[in-house]
Design a protein with these regions (language model features):
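A broad structural signal for short, well-ordered beta-strand segments within beta-sheet-rich domains
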Residues: 18, 60-63, 419
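Helix-rich catalytic cores of soluble enzyme domains
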Residues: 34-276
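N-terminal glycine-rich anion-binding loops that anchor highly charged ligand groups
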Residues: 21-24, 157-162, 375
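Catalytic-core signal marking the mid-to-C-terminal active-site face
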Residues: 294-436
Length: 436
Protein backbone atom coordinates (compact mmCIF):
# COMPACT_ATOMS: atom_id res chain seq x y z
CA UNK A 1 0.00 0.00 0.00
CA UNK A 2 2.98 2.31 0.49
CA UNK A 3 4.58 2.53 -2.92
CA UNK A 4 7.63 4.36 -4.27
CA UNK A 5 7.84 5.52 -7.86
CA UNK A 6 11.52 5.92 -8.60
CA UNK A 7 13.12 8.64 -10.64
CA UNK A 8 16.19 8.07 -12.76
CA UNK A 9 17.83 10.28 -10.14
CA UNK A 10 17.02 9.48 -6.48
CA UNK A 11 16.12 13.09 -5.71
CA UNK A 12 13.06 12.59 -7.91
CA UNK A 13 11.72 9.52 -6.08
CA UNK A 14 8.01 9.82 -5.22
CA UNK A 15 6.56 8.37 -2.03
CA UNK A 16 2.92 7.35 -2.52
CA UNK A 17 1.65 7.17 1.02
CA UNK A 18 -0.41 9.16 3.48
CA UNK A 19 -1.45 12.50 2.03
CA UNK A 20 1.66 13.25 -0.02
CA UNK A 21 0.77 14.86 -3.36
CA UNK A 22 2.77 14.85 -6.57
CA UNK A 23 1.92 16.74 -9.76
CA UNK A 24 2.74 15.46 -13.22
CA UNK A 25 1.93 15.50 -16.89
CA UNK A 26 0.03 13.05 -19.09
CA UNK A 27 -2.16 12.92 -22.16
CA UNK A 28 -2.34 11.61 -25.68
CA UNK A 29 -2.66 14.86 -27.61
CA UNK A 30 -2.34 14.59 -31.37
CA UNK A 31 -1.70 18.32 -31.82
CA UNK A 32 0.68 20.84 -30.32
CA UNK A 33 0.68 24.63 -30.41
CA UNK A 34 3.80 25.71 -32.28
CA UNK A 35 5.64 28.18 -30.04
CA UNK A 36 6.69 30.36 -32.97
CA UNK A 37 3.63 30.39 -35.23
CA UNK A 38 0.99 30.01 -32.46
CA UNK A 39 -0.83 27.55 -34.72
CA UNK A 40 -1.85 23.96 -34.07
CA UNK A 41 0.07 21.24 -35.90
CA UNK A 42 0.58 17.50 -35.48
CA UNK A 43 2.90 16.50 -32.63
CA UNK A 44 6.21 14.70 -33.26
CA UNK A 45 8.77 12.64 -31.37
CA UNK A 46 11.05 15.69 -31.31
CA UNK A 47 8.25 17.65 -29.62
CA UNK A 48 7.97 14.92 -26.99
CA UNK A 49 11.69 15.11 -26.24
CA UNK A 50 11.47 18.91 -25.96
CA UNK A 51 8.54 18.74 -23.56
CA UNK A 52 10.38 16.19 -21.43
CA UNK A 53 13.46 18.38 -21.04
CA UNK A 54 11.27 21.43 -20.44
CA UNK A 55 9.47 19.62 -17.61
CA UNK A 56 12.83 18.41 -16.30
CA UNK A 57 13.43 22.06 -15.32
CA UNK A 58 10.02 22.67 -13.75
CA UNK A 59 10.27 22.55 -9.95
CA UNK A 60 6.62 21.78 -9.27
CA UNK A 61 6.15 19.14 -12.00
CA UNK A 62 7.27 16.06 -10.14
CA UNK A 63 6.91 13.33 -12.77
CA UNK A 64 6.64 13.09 -16.55
CA UNK A 65 3.98 11.03 -18.28
CA UNK A 66 4.10 11.32 -22.05
CA UNK A 67 1.57 14.03 -23.02
CA UNK A 68 1.54 13.72 -26.81
CA UNK A 69 1.40 11.11 -29.56
CA UNK A 70 4.33 10.92 -32.00
CA UNK A 71 2.30 11.51 -35.15
CA UNK A 72 5.39 11.39 -37.37
CA UNK A 73 5.85 7.67 -36.65
CA UNK A 74 3.44 5.41 -38.52
CA UNK A 75 4.58 2.05 -37.16
CA UNK A 76 2.96 1.42 -33.74
CA UNK A 77 5.95 -0.55 -32.47
CA UNK A 78 8.40 2.19 -33.39
CA UNK A 79 6.08 4.79 -31.92
CA UNK A 80 5.82 3.01 -28.57
CA UNK A 81 9.58 2.48 -28.40
CA UNK A 82 10.50 6.04 -29.38
CA UNK A 83 7.91 7.47 -27.01
CA UNK A 84 9.66 5.72 -24.14
CA UNK A 85 13.13 6.58 -25.45
CA UNK A 86 12.39 10.29 -25.95
CA UNK A 87 10.79 10.56 -22.52
CA UNK A 88 13.59 8.94 -20.51
CA UNK A 89 16.21 10.85 -22.52
CA UNK A 90 14.61 14.20 -21.75
CA UNK A 91 14.14 13.96 -17.98
CA UNK A 92 15.62 12.41 -14.85
CA UNK A 93 12.19 12.34 -13.23
CA UNK A 94 9.89 9.33 -13.08
CA UNK A 95 8.46 8.62 -16.53
CA UNK A 96 5.09 7.19 -17.49
CA UNK A 97 4.25 5.79 -20.90
CA UNK A 98 1.94 3.25 -22.56
CA UNK A 99 2.05 0.42 -25.08
CA UNK A 100 -0.41 -1.12 -27.51
CA UNK A 101 1.08 -4.64 -27.74
CA UNK A 102 2.99 -6.80 -25.23
CA UNK A 103 5.92 -7.12 -27.66
CA UNK A 104 6.34 -3.36 -27.42
CA UNK A 105 6.66 -3.65 -23.64
CA UNK A 106 9.46 -6.19 -24.12
CA UNK A 107 11.30 -3.80 -26.45
CA UNK A 108 11.17 -1.04 -23.86
CA UNK A 109 12.26 -3.36 -21.05
CA UNK A 110 15.36 -4.38 -23.01
CA UNK A 111 16.27 -0.72 -23.42
CA UNK A 112 15.55 0.05 -19.77
CA UNK A 113 17.81 -2.80 -18.68
CA UNK A 114 20.62 -1.22 -20.70
CA UNK A 115 20.03 2.21 -19.21
CA UNK A 116 19.75 0.84 -15.66
CA UNK A 117 22.87 -1.32 -15.85
CA UNK A 118 21.11 -4.66 -16.00
CA UNK A 119 17.77 -6.28 -15.26
CA UNK A 120 18.45 -6.58 -11.53
CA UNK A 121 19.24 -2.87 -11.27
CA UNK A 122 16.07 -2.06 -13.21
CA UNK A 123 13.91 -4.21 -10.95
CA UNK A 124 15.44 -2.57 -7.87
CA UNK A 125 14.59 0.95 -9.13
CA UNK A 126 12.02 0.84 -11.97
CA UNK A 127 11.91 4.49 -13.06
CA UNK A 128 9.28 4.01 -15.79
CA UNK A 129 5.64 3.05 -15.21
CA UNK A 130 2.92 2.08 -17.65
CA UNK A 131 -0.53 3.61 -17.91
CA UNK A 132 -2.86 0.83 -18.96
CA UNK A 133 -6.49 1.08 -20.01
CA UNK A 134 -7.10 -2.58 -19.21
CA UNK A 135 -10.86 -2.14 -19.24
CA UNK A 136 -13.33 -1.13 -21.94
CA UNK A 137 -16.16 0.49 -19.99
CA UNK A 138 -18.67 -0.60 -19.03
CA UNK A 139 -17.21 -3.58 -17.15
CA UNK A 140 -15.27 -5.41 -19.87
CA UNK A 141 -11.59 -6.31 -19.95
CA UNK A 142 -9.62 -5.20 -23.02
CA UNK A 143 -7.70 -8.18 -24.41
CA UNK A 144 -4.65 -6.45 -25.95
CA UNK A 145 -4.29 -4.00 -23.07
CA UNK A 146 -4.55 -6.83 -20.56
CA UNK A 147 -1.74 -8.69 -22.32
CA UNK A 148 0.38 -5.53 -22.10
CA UNK A 149 -0.49 -5.34 -18.43
CA UNK A 150 0.77 -8.88 -17.90
CA UNK A 151 4.04 -8.13 -19.70
CA UNK A 152 4.65 -5.01 -17.62
CA UNK A 153 3.89 -6.69 -14.30
CA UNK A 154 6.15 -9.64 -15.08
CA UNK A 155 8.85 -7.19 -16.17
CA UNK A 156 8.80 -5.32 -12.87
CA UNK A 157 7.21 -2.18 -14.29
CA UNK A 158 4.72 -0.32 -12.06
CA UNK A 159 1.27 0.07 -13.62
CA UNK A 160 -1.40 2.74 -13.42
CA UNK A 161 -4.70 0.88 -13.72
CA UNK A 162 -6.94 3.15 -15.75
CA UNK A 163 -10.69 3.05 -16.06
CA UNK A 164 -11.64 5.91 -18.36
CA UNK A 165 -15.36 5.72 -18.95
CA UNK A 166 -17.24 8.80 -20.11
CA UNK A 167 -20.26 9.78 -18.05
CA UNK A 168 -23.38 9.63 -20.15
CA UNK A 169 -21.74 7.40 -22.77
CA UNK A 170 -19.66 4.49 -21.43
CA UNK A 171 -20.35 5.32 -17.78
CA UNK A 172 -23.62 6.33 -16.09
CA UNK A 173 -24.65 9.98 -16.32
CA UNK A 174 -25.27 10.11 -12.56
CA UNK A 175 -21.89 11.07 -11.12
CA UNK A 176 -22.20 8.83 -8.06
CA UNK A 177 -23.02 5.84 -10.26
CA UNK A 178 -20.13 6.67 -12.63
CA UNK A 179 -17.86 6.63 -9.58
CA UNK A 180 -19.23 3.24 -8.51
CA UNK A 181 -18.57 1.74 -11.94
CA UNK A 182 -15.04 3.15 -12.20
CA UNK A 183 -14.17 1.95 -8.70
CA UNK A 184 -15.43 -1.56 -9.47
CA UNK A 185 -13.43 -1.68 -12.70
CA UNK A 186 -10.17 -0.59 -11.06
CA UNK A 187 -10.62 -2.99 -8.14
CA UNK A 188 -11.06 -5.76 -10.70
CA UNK A 189 -7.78 -4.63 -12.24
CA UNK A 190 -6.05 -4.89 -8.87
CA UNK A 191 -7.30 -8.46 -8.52
CA UNK A 192 -5.99 -9.19 -12.02
CA UNK A 193 -2.55 -7.73 -11.24
CA UNK A 194 -2.23 -9.71 -8.03
CA UNK A 195 -3.25 -12.86 -9.86
CA UNK A 196 -0.29 -12.26 -12.20
CA UNK A 197 2.14 -11.45 -9.39
CA UNK A 198 1.17 -10.97 -5.78
CA UNK A 199 2.18 -7.58 -4.44
CA UNK A 200 3.04 -6.12 -7.86
CA UNK A 201 3.28 -2.33 -7.99
CA UNK A 202 -0.11 -0.99 -9.07
CA UNK A 203 -1.83 2.39 -8.75
CA UNK A 204 -5.58 2.99 -8.38
CA UNK A 205 -6.46 4.97 -11.50
CA UNK A 206 -10.20 5.57 -11.67
CA UNK A 207 -10.53 8.29 -14.34
CA UNK A 208 -14.18 8.68 -15.33
CA UNK A 209 -14.51 11.59 -17.74
CA UNK A 210 -17.35 14.06 -18.20
CA UNK A 211 -19.36 14.53 -21.37
CA UNK A 212 -21.03 17.75 -22.37
CA UNK A 213 -24.42 16.09 -22.69
CA UNK A 214 -25.52 18.63 -25.29
CA UNK A 215 -22.89 17.41 -27.77
CA UNK A 216 -21.38 14.21 -26.35
CA UNK A 217 -17.91 15.78 -26.41
CA UNK A 218 -15.56 15.42 -23.47
CA UNK A 219 -15.44 18.36 -21.06
CA UNK A 220 -12.27 18.00 -19.01
CA UNK A 221 -12.44 21.52 -17.62
CA UNK A 222 -15.93 21.25 -16.16
CA UNK A 223 -16.90 21.54 -12.53
CA UNK A 224 -18.43 18.07 -12.77
CA UNK A 225 -15.03 16.71 -13.84
CA UNK A 226 -13.43 18.30 -10.81
CA UNK A 227 -15.80 16.75 -8.27
CA UNK A 228 -15.82 13.36 -9.99
CA UNK A 229 -12.03 13.06 -9.91
CA UNK A 230 -11.97 14.24 -6.31
CA UNK A 231 -14.44 11.48 -5.51
CA UNK A 232 -12.11 8.93 -7.13
CA UNK A 233 -9.24 10.10 -4.94
CA UNK A 234 -11.41 9.78 -1.85
CA UNK A 235 -12.37 6.23 -2.80
CA UNK A 236 -8.68 5.34 -3.04
CA UNK A 237 -8.13 6.92 0.36
CA UNK A 238 -11.03 4.84 1.70
CA UNK A 239 -9.35 1.65 0.47
CA UNK A 240 -5.91 2.94 1.57
CA UNK A 241 -4.49 2.48 -1.94
CA UNK A 242 -1.89 4.52 -3.85
CA UNK A 243 -3.85 6.63 -6.30
CA UNK A 244 -3.54 8.71 -9.42
CA UNK A 245 -6.25 10.94 -10.85
CA UNK A 246 -6.43 13.48 -13.67
CA UNK A 247 -7.02 17.23 -13.38
CA UNK A 248 -6.13 20.31 -15.40
CA UNK A 249 -7.72 19.08 -18.64
CA UNK A 250 -8.98 22.46 -19.81
CA UNK A 251 -11.33 22.66 -22.77
CA UNK A 252 -9.63 25.88 -23.89
CA UNK A 253 -7.32 25.66 -26.89
CA UNK A 254 -4.69 28.15 -25.69
CA UNK A 255 -3.29 29.40 -22.35
CA UNK A 256 -5.98 32.03 -21.88
CA UNK A 257 -8.34 33.08 -19.08
CA UNK A 258 -10.59 30.05 -19.57
CA UNK A 259 -7.57 27.77 -19.35
CA UNK A 260 -6.49 29.45 -16.12
CA UNK A 261 -9.78 29.19 -14.28
CA UNK A 262 -10.53 25.63 -15.42
CA UNK A 263 -7.10 24.37 -14.47
CA UNK A 264 -7.20 26.33 -11.23
CA UNK A 265 -10.31 24.79 -9.73
CA UNK A 266 -9.87 21.27 -11.12
CA UNK A 267 -6.28 20.88 -9.92
CA UNK A 268 -6.93 22.58 -6.57
CA UNK A 269 -9.84 20.29 -5.77
CA UNK A 270 -7.80 17.26 -6.84
CA UNK A 271 -4.90 18.29 -4.61
CA UNK A 272 -7.13 18.77 -1.58
CA UNK A 273 -8.96 15.47 -2.18
CA UNK A 274 -6.02 13.32 -1.15
CA UNK A 275 -4.75 11.93 -4.47
CA UNK A 276 -1.10 10.88 -4.43
CA UNK A 277 -0.51 11.55 -8.13
CA UNK A 278 -2.27 14.21 -10.18
CA UNK A 279 -1.81 13.55 -13.88
CA UNK A 280 -2.61 15.99 -16.72
CA UNK A 281 -1.95 18.85 -14.29
CA UNK A 282 0.18 20.87 -16.72
CA UNK A 283 0.39 21.66 -20.40
CA UNK A 284 -2.81 20.16 -21.79
CA UNK A 285 -5.55 21.89 -23.79
CA UNK A 286 -8.58 21.16 -25.96
CA UNK A 287 -9.90 18.41 -23.66
CA UNK A 288 -6.60 16.50 -24.03
CA UNK A 289 -6.45 16.83 -27.83
CA UNK A 290 -3.92 19.68 -27.70
CA UNK A 291 -0.74 20.64 -25.90
CA UNK A 292 1.11 23.95 -25.50
CA UNK A 293 4.78 24.15 -24.39
CA UNK A 294 4.41 27.53 -22.67
CA UNK A 295 1.59 26.15 -20.56
CA UNK A 296 4.03 23.89 -18.72
CA UNK A 297 5.88 26.98 -17.53
CA UNK A 298 2.68 28.82 -16.59
CA UNK A 299 1.16 25.78 -14.92
CA UNK A 300 4.35 25.17 -12.96
CA UNK A 301 3.67 28.45 -11.13
CA UNK A 302 0.07 27.38 -10.54
CA UNK A 303 1.09 23.97 -9.18
CA UNK A 304 3.53 25.52 -6.75
CA UNK A 305 0.84 27.83 -5.40
CA UNK A 306 -1.69 24.99 -5.13
CA UNK A 307 0.81 22.84 -3.28
CA UNK A 308 1.33 25.75 -0.91
CA UNK A 309 -2.39 25.78 -0.12
CA UNK A 310 -2.24 22.06 0.64
CA UNK A 311 0.66 22.64 3.00
CA UNK A 312 -1.46 25.14 4.92
CA UNK A 313 -0.46 27.15 7.97
CA UNK A 314 2.11 25.75 10.36
CA UNK A 315 0.69 26.02 13.87
CA UNK A 316 3.27 25.25 16.57
CA UNK A 317 4.40 26.71 19.86
CA UNK A 318 7.17 28.44 17.93
CA UNK A 319 4.91 30.02 15.27
CA UNK A 320 2.40 31.11 17.93
CA UNK A 321 5.05 32.55 20.23
CA UNK A 322 4.65 36.22 21.13
CA UNK A 323 8.33 37.14 21.24
CA UNK A 324 8.50 38.66 17.72
CA UNK A 325 5.38 40.74 18.43
CA UNK A 326 6.91 41.90 21.70
CA UNK A 327 10.20 42.72 19.98
CA UNK A 328 8.51 44.86 17.34
CA UNK A 329 5.71 46.53 19.27
CA UNK A 330 7.36 47.24 22.63
CA UNK A 331 11.08 47.63 22.05
CA UNK A 332 11.31 47.71 18.26
CA UNK A 333 10.51 49.94 15.27
CA UNK A 334 6.80 49.10 15.04
CA UNK A 335 7.08 47.02 11.86
CA UNK A 336 8.42 43.60 10.89
CA UNK A 337 10.26 44.49 7.68
CA UNK A 338 13.76 43.95 9.04
CA UNK A 339 12.98 41.46 11.76
CA UNK A 340 15.12 38.32 11.72
CA UNK A 341 12.04 36.09 11.54
CA UNK A 342 10.81 37.90 8.43
CA UNK A 343 14.14 37.30 6.73
CA UNK A 344 14.40 33.66 7.83
CA UNK A 345 10.85 32.78 6.77
CA UNK A 346 11.12 34.58 3.46
CA UNK A 347 12.35 31.40 1.78
CA UNK A 348 10.68 28.74 3.93
CA UNK A 349 7.09 29.95 4.31
CA UNK A 350 6.59 31.95 1.12
CA UNK A 351 6.58 30.89 -2.52
CA UNK A 352 7.39 33.15 -5.45
CA UNK A 353 6.16 32.70 -9.04
CA UNK A 354 8.62 32.34 -11.89
CA UNK A 355 6.58 33.97 -14.65
CA UNK A 356 3.59 35.33 -12.72
CA UNK A 357 3.55 39.14 -12.47
CA UNK A 358 3.78 40.90 -9.10
CA UNK A 359 5.41 44.12 -10.30
CA UNK A 360 3.98 47.59 -9.80
CA UNK A 361 2.17 49.05 -12.79
CA UNK A 362 5.09 51.41 -13.52
CA UNK A 363 7.67 48.63 -13.36
CA UNK A 364 5.49 46.43 -15.55
CA UNK A 365 5.26 49.20 -18.15
CA UNK A 366 9.02 49.82 -18.01
CA UNK A 367 9.68 46.11 -18.55
CA UNK A 368 7.63 45.99 -21.74
CA UNK A 369 4.11 45.36 -20.38
CA UNK A 370 4.29 41.67 -21.25
CA UNK A 371 1.60 39.17 -20.35
CA UNK A 372 2.25 35.79 -18.75
CA UNK A 373 2.15 33.91 -22.06
CA UNK A 374 4.92 36.09 -23.51
CA UNK A 375 7.08 35.61 -20.43
CA UNK A 376 6.45 31.86 -20.46
CA UNK A 377 7.33 31.67 -24.15
CA UNK A 378 10.65 33.39 -23.50
CA UNK A 379 11.38 31.08 -20.57
CA UNK A 380 10.55 28.09 -22.78
CA UNK A 381 12.94 29.28 -25.49
CA UNK A 382 15.73 29.77 -22.95
CA UNK A 383 15.36 26.27 -21.49
CA UNK A 384 15.10 24.49 -24.84
CA UNK A 385 18.16 26.33 -26.15
CA UNK A 386 20.33 25.33 -23.21
CA UNK A 387 19.07 22.29 -21.29
CA UNK A 388 20.16 19.00 -22.88
CA UNK A 389 20.10 16.24 -20.24
CA UNK A 390 23.07 13.87 -20.35
CA UNK A 391 22.17 11.30 -17.70
CA UNK A 392 22.23 8.50 -20.29
CA UNK A 393 25.87 8.00 -21.26
CA UNK A 394 26.93 8.34 -24.92
CA UNK A 395 28.08 4.71 -24.87
CA UNK A 396 24.69 3.42 -23.71
CA UNK A 397 22.88 5.69 -26.15
CA UNK A 398 25.04 4.38 -28.98
CA UNK A 399 24.24 0.80 -28.00
CA UNK A 400 20.52 1.60 -27.93
CA UNK A 401 20.79 3.08 -31.43
CA UNK A 402 22.57 -0.02 -32.70
CA UNK A 403 19.89 -2.35 -31.37
CA UNK A 404 16.70 -0.33 -31.85
CA UNK A 405 15.21 2.05 -34.46
CA UNK A 406 15.69 5.37 -32.67
CA UNK A 407 13.97 8.16 -34.62
CA UNK A 408 15.65 11.11 -32.91
CA UNK A 409 19.01 12.19 -34.31
CA UNK A 410 21.84 13.01 -31.95
CA UNK A 411 22.04 16.47 -33.46
CA UNK A 412 18.39 17.16 -32.68
CA UNK A 413 18.91 15.97 -29.11
CA UNK A 414 22.04 18.07 -28.56
CA UNK A 415 24.06 14.94 -27.80
CA UNK A 416 26.96 15.99 -30.03
CA UNK A 417 27.50 19.28 -28.21
CA UNK A 418 30.86 19.11 -26.46
CA UNK A 419 31.04 15.33 -26.80
CA UNK A 420 33.24 15.11 -29.89
CA UNK A 421 30.94 12.51 -31.41
CA UNK A 422 30.05 11.98 -35.03
CA UNK A 423 26.57 10.92 -36.11
CA UNK A 424 26.22 7.15 -35.92
CA UNK A 425 25.83 5.39 -39.27
CA UNK A 426 22.58 3.87 -37.96
CA UNK A 427 21.17 7.31 -37.10
CA UNK A 428 17.99 6.72 -39.05
CA UNK A 429 17.76 3.21 -37.67
CA UNK A 430 16.34 0.10 -39.22
CA UNK A 431 12.72 -0.87 -38.61
CA UNK A 432 11.95 -3.71 -36.26
CA UNK A 433 12.29 -6.94 -38.26
CA UNK A 434 9.05 -8.93 -38.55
CA UNK A 435 10.03 -11.43 -35.86
CA UNK A 436 12.11 -9.17 -33.63
Amino acid sequence: RNLTLYGFAPEHDLQLQGKKIHFGTAGAAVHIVDSETREYRESTVADLYDIARLCDQMEHIHFFQRPIVCRDLDDPREMDFNTCYASISGTRKHVGTSFVQPEHVEDALKMLHLVSGGEAAWRARPFVSMSNCFVVPPLKFAEDASRCLEAAVRGGMPVLLLSAGQAGATAPAALARALVQATAEVLAGLVYVNAIEKGALAIFGAWPFISDLRTGAMSGGSGEQAVLMAGCAQMAQFYDLPSGIAAGMTDSKLPDAQSGYEKGYTVTLAAHSGAHLIYESAGMHASLLGCCPESYVIDNDMLGAINRTVRGIEVTDETLGLEPIRDVCITGPGHYLGHEETLSRMQTDYLYPEVGDRESVNNWLDQGSTDITERARERTRTILASHYPSHISPEIDEQIRREFPVRLSRERMGLLVGAGLEPAPTEEGLPFPPNF
